[in-house]
């Protein structure tokens, strides 16, 4: 009779860690998390909306995606960089800034707030703004 986790060579410490992580996840207030992420996305959108050639929208979260996200669209005839150039420039920052670039060829990128704290949101907005206001 093999115990749970034994076929995968999992020790009791790892199994207890997994169970504790699950307990913490279940205790977390998911509505509060959604509100926190939505507020961070709103801050990103509000900060970037005032830049020339930039428009933003907030996705709904829920069934569409785990967290509400800020979708940023560039009018590449107005902005000093194309979206692809901006994404590349952000990745050269120190520390690097990674945004969702699946639609960069279409002039859109996404800022996902899930792994950002309030200070990091400010940094991301600052770096995007700096790149889009340079000539």
Model-assigned labels for residue ranges:
Residues 1-52, 58-66:
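Active-site C-terminal subdomain of aminotransferase-like
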Residues 45-129:
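Conserved C-terminal alpha-helix-loop-beta "cap" of PLP-dependent enzymes
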């Amino acid at each position: 009779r093999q115990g749970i986790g034994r076929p995968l060579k999992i020790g009791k410490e790892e199994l207890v860690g997994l169970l504790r992580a699950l307990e913490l996840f279940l205790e977390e207030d998911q509505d509060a998390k959604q509100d926190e992420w939505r507020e961070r996305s709103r801050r990103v959108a509000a900060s970037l909306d005032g830049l020339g050639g930039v428009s933003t929208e907030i996705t709904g979260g829920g069934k569409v995606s785990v967290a509400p996200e800020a979708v940023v669209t560039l009018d590449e005839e107005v902005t000093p960089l194309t979206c692809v150039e901006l994404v590349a420039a952000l990745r050269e920052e120190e520390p690097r800034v990674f945004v969702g670039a699946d639609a960069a060829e279409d002039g859109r990128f996404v800022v996902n707030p899930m792994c950002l704290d309030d200070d990091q949101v400010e940094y991301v907005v600052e770096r995007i703004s700096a790149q889009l206001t340079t000539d």
